[in-house]
Amino acid sequence: MTMSRSSRSSVLALALATGSLVAAGPCDIYSSGGTPCIAAHSTTRALYSSYNGPLYQVQRASDGTTTTITPLSAGGVADASAQDAFCENTTCLITIIYDQSGNGNDLTQAPPGGFNGPDVGGYDNLAGAIGAPVTLNGKKAYGVFVSPGTGYRNNEAIGTATGDEPEGMYAVLDGTHYNDGCCFDYGNAETSSLDTGNGHMEAIYYGTNTAWGYGAGNGPWIMADLENGLFSGQSSDYNAGDPSISYRFVTAILKGGPNLWALRGGNAASGSLSTYYNGIRPTDASGYNPMSKEGAIILGIGGDNSVSAQGTFYEGAMTDGYPDDATENSVQADIVAAKYATTSLISGPALTVGDTVSLKVTTSGYDTRYIAHTGSTINTQVVSSSSSSTLKQQASWTVRTGLASTAAANGCVSFESVDTPGSYIRHSNFALLLNANDGTKLFSEDATFCPQDSFNDDGTNSIRSWNYPTRYWRHYENVLYVASNGGVNTFDAATAFTDDVSWVVADGFA
């Protein structure tokens, strides 16, 4: 039986009145609308009112063990404190994003396909567990922060739409975290991880890629990745009805059936949905009517494992059948009632904007060395009160407001050279460099870092990359990198990682 619009509104009103997330979740609403979820993924909350099973799994680097994160209560917010306790004094990766629908459509580390990922064997990277903290109704949770090279997939999903079968999907994303790479997607893709032709995908895309279609303004845009094209309307090119997005939290909705599809979106923190397109399949390119969907599920990557995009995912689901607008409107109201909000990205002793600091190594045998620079190379050098004024300046850094504004708003900072004003520490190919600020979005993100508690007891802080949150400032052979705790690069070696990424932040020499 289909729940009426008034009944769905009553269910939502009850949730608002009780201050609870459990009166009806998005997948309860989809089910009541006659289009049940066949996959439901979220690291932030349960998507069914009665769900109290696993949301996601994390693995810690210190001993390789895993733990499962569940809601605090049935239908509730994820138990972030369990993750924090498990991952204390080490790093953690999100290894599994569980399907809450009961179909077992879990998302795991994406395998190689048309493109290889950067991890061992061509697999994609896994997301760091702490890169995307938020609150829901005041309770802390973590999203999935996708850096370029990160991706999740299930090529053997059950119950997903294939061929020209109807389906719907939604996702809640970070509207400020994007790039123009291909392709930050969530949805239906090829089961082979290869590009098998036009119309073999149907996935939500978010970003500023203009290689195919694009919308009004400069983006970012919600679009549909239908394979070999990003679409926001009947045309495969420009579509004025698809607006640029400026919301911090974004609801993105895509649905498709035989010669019919729609694209909708809105502010996930307030208000209602807008319809950006509702009409027939693209007519200026072949292969999209009928569609040839294959039924795999992807997150953070393209159907052929394209891995150059970035974005943040909080929750999403895919349905059996083509949801009506009223059902989606009620899902949006439920998302708004969850009250997504930002929270601090930092921990440990605060670094004060405007202060000049020097950072001392804590690794035994190297602890007379400080972070300095020689030209554009960031390295460690032995520095003391008797060192030359030139060296003291090279080893001193002014703490600035983070150049990436979305991260700066939550505590992250940038480090300007004292002896080369206008130049900042940034990473490029994971090496730390001193470069002049060129004003680009990429530079701002590469030069923004989030201080946190030191991993060892000798330091005050570890310094984490904002846009690659699995990576920290590390000295390796006296040169500085942003390094992960184990990985494919020599400077990612797990041995001595804890000490090598822990620093004493002290008053600057100059």
From Swiss-Prot:
Pfam families, per database record: AbfB, ArabFuran-catal
Location within or outside the cell: Secreted
Native source species: Emericella nidulans (strain FGSC A4 / ATCC 38163 / CBS 112.46 / NRRL 194 / M139)
Record function comment: Alpha-L-arabinofuranosidase involved in the degradation of arabinoxylan, a major component of plant hemicellulose. Able to hydrolyze 1,5-, 1,3- and 1,2-alpha-linkages not only in L-arabinofuranosyl oligosaccharides, but also in polysaccharides containing terminal non-reducing L-arabinofuranoses in side chains, like L-arabinan, arabinogalactan and arabinoxylan.
Membrane-spanning intervals of the chain: none
Residues involved in substrate binding: D225, N228, G303, H427, N429, F430, D446, H475, E477, L480, D500
Keyword Hydrolase among record annotations: yes
CC per GO annotation: extracellular region
Molecular function per GO: alpha-L-arabinofuranosidase activity
Encoding gene (name): abfB
This protein's domain notes: Organized into two domains: an N-terminal catalytic domain and a C-terminal arabinose-binding domain (ABD).
Lineage: Eukaryota, Fungi, Dikarya, Ascomycota, Pezizomycotina
Pathway field: Glycan metabolism; L-arabinan degradation
Major location category of this protein: secreted
Protein name: Alpha-L-arabinofuranosidase B
Glycosylation sites: N89
